[in-house]
């Protein structure tokens, strides 16, 4: 559905770009049948979620304007905190056992102005979408947009030291073939 919002077209997802070097149809179909004005409002709302300082996914934004991401955070409640649990001091999702915590959701597309990718992230028992799912979506989206490891300046300044450490750790465990650009699969 996110790809449909991004393009205002009926989109059938495809997992394979080409077979034996022959590119397969893109999956983009007929117009969705929703007015451009309504789609523009939804897209703008998703852009604000990620790129406005008050947006729930602002901390997971992509810095480069030409690669700006639009998205929507979400939380799927697994169960209510009961009155008895509240009486025992359980007041937050984090206070519950892992298997009872809410699921974190985030959907996104990018670049905002000329969408090429759409994705959905679900982190089971991850809590809120902005804290658990949106950062994963941003990292996956950056990998897709850059065709590999993105530069640190693609990330918000406050995250760059942590991201640099994570990238260095990943380089240590990557298979040699992946480093040489060869696919292991």
Predicted regions and their residues:
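Gram-negative outer-membrane assembly/targeting C-terminal domains
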Residues: 145-185
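Active-site beta-strand/loop architecture of penicillin-binding DD-peptidases
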Residues: 2-31, 37, 46, 50-151
């Amino acid at each position: 559905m996110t790809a449909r919002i991004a393009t205002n077209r009926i989109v059938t997802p495809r997992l394979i770009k080409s077979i034996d070097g022959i590119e397969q149809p893109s999956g983009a179909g007929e117009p969705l049948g929703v007015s451009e004005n309504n789609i523009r409002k939804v897209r703008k709302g998703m852009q604000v979620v990620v790129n406005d300082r008050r947006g729930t996914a602002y901390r997971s934004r992509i810095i480069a304007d030409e690669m700006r991401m639009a998205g929507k955070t979400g939380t799927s409640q697994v169960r209510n905190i009961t009155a008895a649990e509240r009486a025992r001091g359980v007041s937050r999702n984090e206070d519950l056992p892992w298997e009872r915590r809410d699921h974190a959701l985030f959907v996104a597309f990018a670049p905002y102005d000329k969408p090429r990718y759409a994705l959905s992230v679900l982190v089971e028992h991850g809590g809120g979408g902005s804290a658990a799912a949106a950062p994963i979506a941003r990292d996956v989206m950056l990998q897709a947009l850059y065709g590999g490891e993105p530069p640190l300046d693609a990330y918000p300044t406050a995250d760059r030291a942590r991201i640099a450490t994570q990238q260095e750790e990943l380089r240590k465990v990557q298979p040699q073939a992946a480093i040489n650009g060869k696919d292991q699969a």
